[in-house]
Design a protein with these regions (language model features):
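P/S/T/G-enriched low-complexity
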Residues: 2-8, 29, 36-469
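Glycine-centered recognition micro-motifs in short, flexible terminal segments and loops
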Residues: 2-26
């Protein structure tokens, strides 16, 4: 009987569509319920991943990078995650696992979580929740505490007019000067112009430049340093006064100190290491190198003109700087050391006859007495290498040496180092080699030295946080 009924049911074609539909409804409902719950779980995971991203980034912001208590760092990340992870549809707010790894100035934060998304069809899946998990990793290097040593060229070549218009005005304004200083683009500073006491009728070219309101390259350098240490500078962080250094120190929550040195034929101390604000009060003492008169740099030591020893300036600063530290706030650590060299890149100095000048220097070199010669050459980078080998960075701003094709001395002594252009010649190449990677900039005559020096400083001082996963 039962067998016959089953066979009859199997061979009966009436209502077969309804029966098939009824039979397939069970897996269809199962699939629909599972799909809906899975989709909702994925959406929750995306939202929780965003919360983990925010928590990781929050823990590597500049203000947090100075925090050495890992419990505080973890608590900050957990609080940010909890605020963003309080989502409807979760069985509870998940508690993240926060891992803090510090390596020197670098900090890596990993925020991971496991959560339970509530299912709308628990009976279909046979479970009340769907588990989701994820993680986010952020890494940043804190801006280190740094000591900055400004090393500024104040040799006579920095007395060039700041722009072509200033150069033209300088040449015109010196048309009545003695023959050695007449129609000259440089505002050289002589204590005894024409080897006589200064007077209303006997002026050096610097006096002429000031009387005619001519801006010199040294003025632009001075203004650039002022922008760094004094301002005005509009800082994104409210309540910060001063210049770029004070602003970046506040933004990075770090400590900067600054020293100012100049060089001509020797190293000159303007301000030893102190706060940028205190150093800024001494900027007015950045002055052009004075000479007694032409061919007499130092009175009673009259031999020839000279006055630019870049390598000597670097060596002098190197002897002053202590061994660099890591720049962290950890006990016993000390700041990093950074040299900022601003120069036109050409040395003009006395060397022993037994020493060597650049092979491309024009020979015979002018003799100075029985033991010395005058050497004009691009910077010899050996002094730079010595500094960098100590772990000290060098930032270089090259105020490009102006090509002077009409000047006989330039054509004979300098042109071979400054071709095919001031941006690409040997002078520029040597300075770029002197600089630490990424810390070289150049500015042509008429360019904005303040902006160039500020950009270079910000490049040294900047730190960023980034998600790596």
């Amino acid at each position: 009987m039962l067998r016959r009924a089953v066979l009859r049911f199997g061979s009966d074609r009436k209502a077969n569509v309804a029966i098939i539909f009824a039979l397939t409804m069970v897996p269809i409902i199962f699939l629909l319920g599972m799909t809906l719950d899975y989709t909702l779980a994925l959406r929750k995971r995306e939202q929780l991943n965003a919360a983990a991203d925010a928590a990781a980034i929050a823990a590597v912001r500049p203000a947090m990078l100075t925090q050495t208590d890992t419990a505080v760092v973890k608590a900050t990340a957990e609080a940010v995650f909890a605020a963003k992870a309080n989502l409807p549809g979760l069985s509870s707010v998940p508690t993240p696992t926060v891992t803090v790894t510090d390596t020197g100035l670098a900090r890596t934060i990993t925020v991971s979580y496991t959560a339970q998304s509530i299912n709308n069809f628990p009976g279909v899946l046979g479970k009340q929740t769907w588990q989701v998990n994820g993680s986010a990793t952020a890494r940043a290097s804190s801006a280190p505490n740094m000591n900055f040593y400004m090393l500024l060229d104040v040799s006579p070549s920095m007395a060039l007019g700041a722009t072509q218009a200033d150069i033209d005005k300088m040449i015109s304004a010196t048309s009545s000067q003695p023959s050695y200083a007449r129609n000259c683009a440089f505002a050289c500073h002589e204590i005894h112009p024409n080897n006589q006491n200064p007077s209303s009728t006997n002026k050096d070219n610097l006096t002429v430049a000031r009387a005619n309101n001519i801006t010199l390259r040294i003025d632009l350098v001075t203004n650039a340093v002022k922008q760094l240490m004094v301002g005005p500078w509009t800082c994104p962080q409210s309540g910060v006064s001063g210049g770029v250094m004070q602003c970046m120190a506040a933004l990075n929550n770090t400590t900067y100190k600054a020293a100012i040195y100049t060089f001509d034929y020797k190293l000159n101390t303007v301000q030893t290491l102190t706060t940028p604000t205190t150093a800024g009060t001494q900027i007015a003492n950045i002055k052009l190198m004075p000479v007694d008169h032409q061919n007499c740099v130092i009175i009673n030591q009259c031999s020839t003109d000279y006055g630019s020893d870049i390598a000597g300036g670097l060596t002098g600063v190197n002897n002053i700087m202590p061994a660099p530290g890591g720049g962290t706030n950890q006990a016993g650590d000390t700041p990093q050391e950074v040299v900022f060299l601003v120069t036109d890149g050409v040395e003009d100095k006395l060397i022993l006859k037994s020493a060597s000048c650049d092979p491309a220097a024009t020979y015979p070199l002018p003799a100075v007495g029985s033991t010395q010669v005058r050497c004009q050459q691009p910077l010899n980078t050996a002094a730079c290498t010595t500094i960098k080998n100590r772990g000290i960075r060098i930032a270089v701003l090259y105020t490009e040496y102006l090509q002077l094709p009409a000047d006989d001395w330039y054509k004979k002594k300098i042109a071979q180092f400054n071709n095919p252009s001031s941006s690409t010649g040997m002078i520029a190449q040597r300075l770029q080699s002197c600089a630490s990677p990424g810390l070289y900039a150049s500015v042509q005559t008429g360019g904005d030295i303040s902006d160039a020096l500020t950009d270079l400083f910000i490049k040294v001082a900047s730190s960023t946080a980034s998600l790596v996963q």
